[in-house]
Design a protein with these regions (language model features):
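Conserved phosphate- and dinucleotide-binding cores of soluble alpha/beta proteins
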Residues: 1-121
Length: 121
């Protein structure tokens, strides 16, 4: 599975308010919050926030974690907090859905210098 981490720590469209590490579904409809929608503009996917859909379909966290391998690519300084939180917080829970990858034995995280800028290396 190839995925990324959002500015608020989301994976797929599993944002902190709606992520569920025990979701019984594989795919679910989600409402995109303002942070997630603005990121779509920041990433160049849409010209304005008004162009960004308010809802999407997303693989759930358990569906993502069921993959044998996770290849997570995280470029951009705007994602530095999410990378730091994913790797260093004591909590592995829905406050930062990307923390779920820490329990996955086949996850690899690829960062650029900008997204890794908050890490103490």
């Amino acid at each position: 599975m190839v995925l990324g981490i959002g500015e608020n720590g989301h994976i797929a469209f599993n944002d902190p308010p709606v992520a569920d590490f025990n979701d019984p579904l594989l795919i679910k409809p989600v409402e995109l919050d303002a942070v997630c929608r603005q990121q779509q503009v920041n990433d160049g996917c849409f010209a304005t926030i008004d162009d960004v859909p308010t809802h999407a379909l997303s693989l759930t966290v358990p569906a993502l974690m069921s993959a044998a391998k996770l290849f997570c690519s995280v470029p951009a300084k705007t994602k530095a907090w999410a990378v730091k939180e994913t790797l260093t917080t004591d909590r592995i829970d829905e406050h930062c859905p990307a923390t779920a990858m820490r329990k996955h034995g086949g996850a690899t995280l690829y960062c650029d210098a900008d997204s890794a800028s908050m890490l103490e290396l």
